[in-house]
Amino acid sequence: MPSEGRCWETLQALRSSDKGRLCYYRDWLLRGEDVLEECMCLPKLSSYSGWVVEHVLPHMQENQPLSETSPSSTSASALDQPSFVPKSPDTSSAFSPASPATPNGTKGKDESQHTESMVLQSSRGIKVEGCIRMYELVHRMKGTEGLRQWQEEQERKVRALSEMASEQLKRFDEWKELKQHKEFQDLREVMEKSSREALGHQEKLKAEHRHRAKILNLKLREAEQQRVKQAEQERLRKEEGQVRLRALYALREEMLQLSQQLDASEQHKGLLKVDLAAFQTRGNQLCSLISGIIRASSESGYPTTESQAEAERALQEMRDLLMNLGQEITRACEDKRRQDEEEAQVKLQEAQMQQRPEAHKEPPAPSQGPGGKQNEDLQVKVQDITMQWYQQLQDASMQCVLTFEGLTNSKDSQAKKIKMDLQKAATIPVSQISTIAGSKLKEIFDKIHSLLSGKPVQSGGRSVSVTLNPQGLDFVQYKLAEKFVKQGEEEVASHHEAAFPIAVVASGIWELHPRVGDLILAHLHKKCPYSVPFYPTFKEGMALEDYQRMLGYQVKDSKVEQQDNFLKRMSGMIRLYAAIIQLRWPYGNRQEIHPHGLNHGWRWLAQILNMEPLSDVTATLLFDFLEVCGNALMKQYQVQFWKMLILIKEDYFPRIEAITSSGQMGSFIRLKQFLEKCLQHKDIPVPKGFLTSSFWRS
């Protein structure tokens, strides 16, 4: 409340006034003292009078002339000052007259004289005056002490303020540093954000660039693919054109041969009832037609399929023409023979007429297969040039055997040892051929090549060379070729993939040593006549076992091997042959042609299709040959090869099926499914086990 606040202010003001600072003794009544005792007693000097006289009065006398106030006023003013009487005995003793205030007796004498001259005042006034002086001194000392304490307090406050200011300055510096750090962080974040945005923009530009580059590469790739496709189409068109052109030349060659046969029929002109000139005129027209087609095709670039078809129709017409002429000649000859017989019947006697049918009766020519059944339809005549080639190879093989006959029949132990070492050196490396690594295959090839080149090789821990015997090279070549074929008969028959490493080594040796290749063919044709292709005929007087051996069957103790084993061996040798004609040694001279290339595979396939099929055998061999060599023939002959496959499907399959029994349909079904799958996908897969470029790096 306001009144209470004013009361407290009043009390505080009274306490701060001079009277409020007076000291009052409240326990005087308890001590039994009389209030008026001191007033009623006689005046007496205070115990402080000596000190006052000594210290205070001299100063008062000196300052009295200068003072403008009277003693009475001074006393009055002194009386008005608060009186403080210390109660401490120490203080009283300090101001007592007994304290040593007079150093000598002279001074004490002067003081006594001075004291005597002074007018004695009342004891209470002196006491009050002393108290006043004492109070002033105490007050002054207290003020000095308070000032000192105040100064110390102020210094303390100044130090505190200084420390506080220092702390505030530190806080300010910290705050400023924090602010700068925050600004730096903000600036750094802004810079990082800007950098990230720049990087993002850069990445975006890079992505756009990559996208555009990808699109451009795709376009370039598409353009390149289109160019390659067009180039491939152009190449195929040219190759097809060249094939058609070669076919046209072949047709013209055949046409000319037929024309020569037509001209050769002049000797029968007298027998014919028809006009031979009409046949010759039509033949000349057909020859001119084919020549005109070839001439027009040469001028326009390459012949078209229509031109080829027209030429084939002309050739077919020429064949029909020649066949009709042959029929006319045959008919005329029959008529002439009939006339001769009739004339002979008139001239000869009845006995001679009875003998004439026996003379004209043809002797039987039995043709029996391995089972003893007659198979006259299998006796298809092979082309003369093929039989000549077959016979030349067999003659060369026999001549080679005769050459080293002295070495094989020698009784000399040294010669026998040389023969055994040479045989091992020739056959063991062939047995070691495998698909383990290309480097291993190259070592085997180099060893065989060194042996055939007359260089010494290591075999069985000994050095062997064909120069150890004059007949050593012939012997090694024969045994090496025999071993290659035997590997096809045994190893390839069991593991079809083995055909390729064996074939590539055989092909490389064949290229460097052609005689070995001829001996390989001779051994192959002898063990597998279907690789010619050649179907041996059963001749009159021939033993059945000999005929079965000619067909390729193994006969031991008059027992013929099982059909499955026979087909397995034939399959292995055909697979080896199909691999040889398509493979070349990768380290050889690429500029030289293959010594026995794909053209022989085309020839084999064409000739096998021109012959009547054999039950179970033809289907098996065709499947093996096409599975191994079909991909290479497809790449080489392309359209013509596909035409041949269509021919097999449409014309040859019915012929095989017609002669195949229900128990032998497995091989035919396998061939049929393989061919239909190839025609459906328009591709022949790469055979399993084919040697790739990575194999030669292993």
UniProtKB/Swiss-Prot annotation:
Q: Region Disordered: start and end of each range?
A: 63-121, 335-375
Keyword Transport found: yes
Q: Keywords for this entry? A: Coiled coil, Cytoplasm, mRNA transport, Nuclear pore complex, Nucleus, Phosphoprotein, Protein transport, Translocation, Transport
- InterPro entries, per database record: GLE1, GLE1-like_sf
For the region Mediates the shuttling between the nucleus and the cytoplasm, what residue ranges are annotated? Answer: 444-483
Coiled-coil-forming residues are 152-270, 304-356
Where is the protein found, in the record's own terms? Nucleus; Cytoplasm; Nucleus, Nuclear pore complex
Composition bias type Low complexity, residue spans: 65-79, 88-103
Q: Which residues carry this modification: Phosphoserine?
A: S88, S99
Family named by the database record = Belongs to the GLE1 family.
Query: What is the protein named?
Result: mRNA export factor GLE1
Biological source species: Pongo abelii
Gene behind this chain? Answer: GLE1
